[in-house]
UniProtKB/Swiss-Prot annotation:
InterPro entries named among the record's database cross-references: Ig_E-set, ML_dom, NPC2-like
A GO term for molecular function: sterol binding
Keyword Signal: yes
Official protein name in the record: Putative phosphatidylglycerol/phosphatidylinositol transfer protein DDB_G0282179
Residues listed as glycosylation sites in the UniProt record: 134
Keyword terms: Glycoprotein, Lipid transport, Signal, Transport
PANTHER family assigned to the protein according to its UniProt record, in alphabetical order: NIEMANN PICK TYPE C2 PROTEIN NPC2-RELATED, PHOSPHATIDYLGLYCEROL_PHOSPHATIDYLINOSITOL TRANSFER PROTEIN
UniProt signal peptide: 1-20
Similarity field: Belongs to the NPC2 family.
Function: Catalyzes the intermembrane transfer of phosphatidylglycerol and phosphatidylinositol.
Organism domain of life: Eukaryota
Gene source species: Dictyostelium discoideum
Coiled-coil regions, chain positions: none
GO biological process: sterol transport
Amino acid sequence: MIKTILLLLINFMLILIVNGDIWNYCDGNINPTFKINKLTLLPDPPLVGKEVTISLEGSLNEQITSGSSIFNVAFFINGGWRQLPTFHNDICKVLSCPVSAGPFTYSTSIKVPIFTPHGQYKGQLTLTDQSNRNVTCLTFQTYLK
């Protein structure tokens, strides 16, 4: 059950990040070990209640044997940003560790839950490795239809 929830959260995060090239590296994203070459989303933009395919391509400079992610998101409602819960996760619960250095690809298809609110979102994803070093840090802002 926890793994299913974690996968849904990671996939939702990827939907938000890739929608309309609205992601950027965080300010101060110093010496990231993962460089994103391409993020794609079909259809773009994603639609609530429909299936979406998310694909990621990049390059990892060092092997990852373990690590963590911190994902925070805010939703714009009633004229202001409302912070949603922050999620702390183990990278190896989503990916098979160790993750080897070199080219990296990830692709998945999911149905965007019908209960997902339409609207404007913003947030940040920070990934760290087994030594608590920066893997990458991304910010995003998007609209989910």
